[in-house]
């Protein structure tokens, strides 16, 4: 899943527009997310492990906000021969087009239905696994509860939701420390102060992270009684919830 280096914010911008998953971002997304999200590779690899353990024969897997297909590829490698179908959804045509190319590079008997749509409009049924990988934080906060409810209803008993998100913290010293560590991570991966500042400004109005208790309360309210954080690095975490 090759991409060119992310230099989108390397030059000073007079006007910084809101972040969009457009063609420019899609072209550098693999590099961008690897250099911006600590533990991203570990999360992607472990999605395949979750699928191996939890995906049941003749069921469906939903990758909601599939971007370039990294999660779908990780899962598909581990479920061959189970008669399953993966439904991969993204509302960015540029992401879907590149995802299609990435998926076609690997031979597989597991079909992937690639859909360019808003994940809030997708019906979920017969699912043994649903993936929300750094996706929900871009939805309007008032729509998140409804989405989790729809996922819960569409999961088969024993099915899982894997939810990865950036977190915010009510404890201000903790928030400051983890934020600083994340910034150091980006600096160590070659991002300049200008790039970091401009990217943060572009995300300010479009990415609204929740606290961990907010995620937990939302999962519990919609019927999940078994859930836990399985991975965390700084202010990025991944949770698993079992129906």
Curated annotation (Swiss-Prot):
Biological process according to GO: tRNA wobble uridine modification
Domain of life the protein comes from: Bacteria
Enzyme Commission identifier(s): 2.1.3.-
Swiss-Prot/TrEMBL keywords: S-adenosyl-L-methionine, Transferase
Molecular-function annotations in GO: carboxyl- or carbamoyltransferase activity; S-adenosyl-L-methionine binding
Residues annotated to bind S-adenosyl-L-methionine: 40, 65-67, 90-91, 118-119, 133, 200
Record carries keyword Transferase: yes
Catalysed reaction equations from the record: prephenate + S-adenosyl-L-methionine = carboxy-S-adenosyl-L-methionine + 3-phenylpyruvate + H2O
Transferase in keyword set: yes
Pfam family, one: Methyltransf_25
Subunit structure as annotated in this protein's UniProt entry: Homodimer.
Role this protein plays: Catalyzes the conversion of S-adenosyl-L-methionine (SAM) to carboxy-S-adenosyl-L-methionine (Cx-SAM).
Protein name: Carboxy-S-adenosyl-L-methionine synthase
Top-level taxonomy: Bacteria, Pseudomonadati, Pseudomonadota, Gammaproteobacteria, Alteromonadales
């Amino acid at each position: 899943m090759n991409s060119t280096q992310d230099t989108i914010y390397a030059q000073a911008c007079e006007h910084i527009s809101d972040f969009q998953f457009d063609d420019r971002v899609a072209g550098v997304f693999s590099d961008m997310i690897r250099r911006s999200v600590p533990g991203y590779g570990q999360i992607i690899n472990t999605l395949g492990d979750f699928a191996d353990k939890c995906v049941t024969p003749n069921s469906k897997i939903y990758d909601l906000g599939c971007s370039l297909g990294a999660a779908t590829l990780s899962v598909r490698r581990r479920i061959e021969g189970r008669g399953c179908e993966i439904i991969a959804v993204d509302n960015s045509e540029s992401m879907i087009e590149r995802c299609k190319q990435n998926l076609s590079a690997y031979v597989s008997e597991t079909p992937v239905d690639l859909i360019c749509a808003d994940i809030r409009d997708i019906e979920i049924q017969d699912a043994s696994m649903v993936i929300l990988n750094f996706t929900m934080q871009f939805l309007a906060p008032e729509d998140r509860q409804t989405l989790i409810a729809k996922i819960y209803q569409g999961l088969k008993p024993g099915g899982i939701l894997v939810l990865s998100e950036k977190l915010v913290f009510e404890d201000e010293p903790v928030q400051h420390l983890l934020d600083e560590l994340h910034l150091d991570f980006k600096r160590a991966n070659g991002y300049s102060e200008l790039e970091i500042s401009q990217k943060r400004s572009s995300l300010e109005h479009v990415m609204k992270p929740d606290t961990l208790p907010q995620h937990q309360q939302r999962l519990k309210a919609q019927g999940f009684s078994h859930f836990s954080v399985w991975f965390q690095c700084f202010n990025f975490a991944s949770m698993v919830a079992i129906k």
